[in-house]
Structure formats: structure tokens, C-alpha cells
A protein has these predicted regions:
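Terminal, non-catalytic protein-protein interaction segments that mediate quaternary/complex assembly
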Residues: 2-310
Length: 310
């Protein structure tokens, strides 16, 4: 017999089950890029019905402002953190900052995550925010995500896929790909969420995203909400209702310094999902602004602090 009725929402339920799965079945990996160490599983899938509500976790408070601005940043085809930091979003600062330290020979002077490192990053961010020339030189994350969405060797994939949804909704080629192999080494971080595909059935637009690397505690909750919002946006501009969001997860891991936090989140009882109201109808996805979105009835547990691994 299904236990779904015992749960307030399937988003938190599936996420908590994934955390439990990793904690129980995960294999320890110490030889990974960041040096933090992980426990990981491989090949998992999440599926959400967007008609149930907006897929934003309630078992910890989520940074919806950051999720929305990051997605608008991707849609713009931008990769410079200046747009984000000028809007109070600091989720990508670590990568260009670390590159800056290495280029200046300061990475030994400011060890990662030390108090000195944090203070110096604050000064770096202020320069990016207020000095356009400095931002152009040091604030860029390279040709990742939005750059590839909007200019994959000259192809505006996002524009194309929306036009194709309108003209040929039965197509099996409604794909946007962020993995541009010759340019991966020029990116601050190669894309974790690599590609996504749309499908139209019974008047509903559904999205499936493939993710090669999944920071389950910090990154995945962002990714779920971001692709949920992207699906809502594209559904509106193409005249469909939102359908399902499916995530195919490859290397699905918890960093070793996130285990305690994960166990805490598993214990929390979910609230009902919120609703995302799109305040303004637009014809083009490129016309959306932050003010066009209103999150309603969002109940949540307190945030859980965790350190990002760079």
C-alpha cells in the first residue's frame, strides 16, 4: 500500500528519502576534486507533479531570491557575478574569487574558509559590485550554463527550443545542452546540471533534467526549484500548463561536512508546498523580471547552515 497520503508534500518526501538513501547506502569517496570528501550513490531519479504546488523545500528555509535571480542570470546568457551581487545574491562568489587569489598568488595567504579568506572575499565582492573594469576582468565564471544556453557555437538554444515548442510540440528534440566539451576547462565550474528536455502531452509542458554531479544538501534544493520555475516560465510563454518535473541524478553525493545537517533535515516534518504566482503575462521569456514572481503561502523550518565546497 502506498504511503504517499501520510506525507504533506512529495517534494520534501522524495528529498528526505534521497538523503536517507545516501546516508544508508552511500560509498565514501575521499579522492574527489574539492578535498572535502563525500559519500555517494549513483543513478537516482526524482519526479514532481507541478500541479501540486511549487517545488520548494519546506524542511529548511530556501533562498528563493537567489534561486530566481540565478535563473534570470542564466536566461540572460550572463556569467559574470556582478549582476548577482548587485542584487544581493552571493551564491557564485567563491569560484571567481578563488581564481583571483590563485592568479595573484594569494591562495596560500588566504587559506580556504579561514576568517581572512572570508574577509578578503568580502573586499573582492565589493570591487566587483562597484568597479566595472575589475568585474569584467575577475568576476566572470567563464562560458558555463547561461552562456551555453544562449550561445552554443552561435546557437541560441533557449530561444530555439521555445520557438520549436510553439511550432512543433510533438518533437523529441526539445533539448538545451550546457555541456560544451571543448570549453569545459575554461569554466569556473563545469555544468553540474548538464542538459534538459521538454515534452508536451495533454496540454501540459513537462521538463526532464540530467545532472552529472549533485551536491545533495546545498545544490539540489536550488536545482529542483530553479527547473520548476523555468518550466513555469516556458509553459506560460508557450501557452501550456505546467506538467511534471523529472530529475535524473548521476553522482549524487553528500559532503562529509553535511552529514549532521542532513540527519537534522530528515527529522523535520514537511509543510504543504507553496504556490508561485506569475504576476505578469509576457510573450517572451527574456522579458521576465524578478518582480514578476510572488511566492505565496510558504511555510518553512529554519535554515540549516552548511559550508560550500569549492
Amino acid at each position: 500500500m502506498s504511503t504517499r497520503k501520510k506525507w504533506v508534500n512529495s517534494v520534501d518526501r522524495q528529498y528526505q528519502e534521497l538523503l536517507s538513501d545516501i546516508l544508508k547506502n552511500g560509498v565514501k569517496e575521499t579522492k574527489e576534486r574539492t578535498g572535502t570528501g563525500t559519500i555517494k550513490v549513483f543513478g537516482r531519479m526524482l519526479k514532481f507533479d507541478l500541479s501540486e504546488g511549487f517545488p520548494l523545500l519546506t524542511t529548511k528555509k530556501m533562498f528563493i531570491k537567489g534561486i530566481t535571480y540565478e535563473l534570470l542570470w542564466f536566461i540572460k546568457g550572463d556569467s559574470n557575478i556582478r549582476y548577482l551581487v548587485r542584487n544581493g545574491v552571493n551564491i557564485w562568489n567563491e569560484w571567481p574569487f578563488q581564481k583571483y587569489l590563485q592568479a595573484k598568488g594569494l591562495d596560500k595567504k588566504y587559506p580556504k574558509y579561514s576568517q581572512e579568506w572570508s574577509l578578503e572575499m568580502g573586499r573582492f565582492v565589493e570591487k566587483v559590485k562597484n568597479d566595472i573594469k575589475f568585474a569584467k576582468k575577475w568576476g566572470d565564471c567563464g562560458p558555463f550554463y547561461g552562456v551555453q544556453w544562449r550561445n552554443f557555437w552561435g546557437v541560441d538554444q533557449l530561444k530555439w527550443v521555445i520557438e520549436e515548442i510553439r511550432k512543433n510540440p510533438g518533437s523529441r528534440r526539445l533539448i538545451v545542452n550546457a555541456w560544451n566539451a571543448p570549453l569545459v576547462d575554461k569554466m569556473a565550474l563545469p555544468p553540474c546540471h548538464v542538459m534538459y528536455q521538454f515534452n508536451i502531452a495533454k496540454g501540459k509542458l513537462s521538463c526532464m533534467m540530467y545532472q552529472r554531479s549533485v551536491d545533495t544538501f546545498l545544490g539540489l534544493p536550488f536545482n529542483i526549484a530553479s527547473y520548476g520555475l523555468l518550466t513555469l516560465m516556458i509553459a506560460q510563454v508557450t501557452g501550456y500548463k505546467p506538467g511534471e518535473l523529472t530529475l535524473a541524478l548521476a553522482d549524487t553525493h553528500l559532503y562529509l561536512n553535511h552529514l549532521k545537517q542532513s540527519k537534522e533535515q530528515i527529522k523535520r516534518k514537511p509543510f504543504p508546498l507553496p504556490k508561485m504566482k506569475v504576476e505578469r503575462k509576457v510573450k517572451s521569456i527574456f522579458d521576465f523580471k524578478f518582480e514578476d514572481f510572488e511566492l505565496r503561502n510558504y511555510q518553512f523550518h529554519p535554515p540549516i547552515k552548511a559550508e560550500i565546497s569549492v
